[in-house]
Amino acid sequence: MIILDTGVLSIVQRGERPAYDHLVARLDVADDEVVVCVVSFEEQMRGWLAYIARSKSSNQQIAAYARLHAMLDDFATRPVVGFDRSAAAEFERMLRLKLRIGTMDLRIAGIALAQDALLLSKNLTDFRKVPGLRVEDWTV
């Protein structure tokens, strides 16, 4: 299993070149299932909801809701891995290690560890602090 973290998923969603081209070239030949996780859904949802809350004009709100809707449609087309008891146990183990990594990234790492999955991320600096986590950047 290959999990796209939120940053890599955003590159896919936006078709951000050249990172998108590098990533897709590797994913196209990968044998493992490619998934996203519910934590990425939460992160993107929170971001769009905050943007909607800050929108002042109808045009801004219309555009923001359209992006929120597009995000929802995108997640509906992808396999999404949840945050279950195994992921929570990994998350709690990492908290005890006092790793200096953001909470959401720790949750994503917990899911990847619990699934014995390869995590694709541009944030190698933080994720490489997690013992046992397999993480690579396929966008370069």
Language-model-derived ranges and their functions:
Residues M1-V39, A50-H69:
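Short, well-structured N-terminal submotif of metal-dependent ribonuclease cores
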Residues M1, A109, L113-V140:
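Acidic, PIN/NYN-like endoribonuclease modules and their adjacent C-terminal/linker elements
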Residues L9-S10, E42-M45, R128, E136:
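Nucleotide phosphate-binding site architecture
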Residues V8, S40, A87, I108, ...:
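Alpha-helix capping/helix-boundary segments
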Residues E33, R46-I52, D73-L120:
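Active-site neighborhoods of divalent-metal-dependent phosphate/nucleic-acid chemistry enzymes
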Residues V38-V39, D84, N123, T139:
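Residues at the C-termini of beta-strands that transition into short coil/loop
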Residues A30, A76, V130-P131:
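Short, structured coil segments at secondary-structure junctions
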Residues Q13-E16, W48, L95, P131, ...:
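Short, flexible helix/strand-to-coil boundary loops that buttress conserved ligand/catalytic motifs
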